[in-house]
A protein has these predicted regions:
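Terminal, regulation- and interaction-focused segments at domain boundaries
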Residues: 1-30, 128
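Solvent-exposed residues in well-ordered beta-strands and their adjoining turns
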Residues: 13-15, 61, 87, 98
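Short Gly/charged-rich anion-binding patches and loops
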Residues: 21-22, 39, 118, 122
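N- and C-terminal low-complexity/disordered segments
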Residues: 24-25, 36-38, 132
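Compact, glycine-rich, soluble single-domain proteins
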Residues: 33-86
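Beta-strand/loop substructures that line and gate deep hydrophobic ligand-binding cavities in soluble
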Residues: 83-109
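Well-ordered alpha/beta subsegment
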Residues: 106-134
Length: 134
């Protein structure tokens, strides 16, 4: 799975709409709910009048993992929810999720590492399975 230094990413030949549908289903399968969504394309068009390709940010949260993390460190709320993005560039659909291990490494708390690892594993599964064909 291609990644940046802070994301778990892949590309797919799926349409934008199909990729969003699959990401939502895989998030649910991994115990995540979508707390918010930001249609970046629509927002930039409305606020700036620019035309962009589809770009959607899904703010995902696994309640059990969030509860464990916030119980250990209440300030972690500033890093939540975990963002998953689906966007189109150059006729290709991209799916990316935040790498929770990288994100939580800035906190400097070793006791949070198991939670971060579990979130990373679950989000990596979402990104990977969203592009699988049956």
């Amino acid at each position: 799975m291609p990644t940046t230094s802070y994301t778990l990413s892949t590309t797919t030949e799926l349409s934008f709409e199909e990729a969003v549908e699959r990401v939502r289903a895989e998030l649910q399968a991994e115990g995540f709910g979508v707390l918010c969504e930001i249609d970046v394309q629509a927002t930039l068009h409305e606020k700036l009048g620019v035309e962009e390709e589809p770009y959607l940010i899904l703010g995902a949260c696994n309640p059990s993992l969030a509860h464990r993390a916030l119980s250990a460190e209440p300030e972690l709320g500033t890093l939540l929810p975990c963002n998953v993005v689906v966007y189109r560039r150059d006729e290709t659909t991209h799916i990316s999720a935040i790498d929770a291990e990288r994100m939580l490494s800035i906190v400097g708390r070793d006791d949070l590492a198991p939670i971060a690892a579990e979130v990373r594993t679950r989000l990596a599964a979402v990104v990977e399975r969203a592009t699988k064909t049956s």
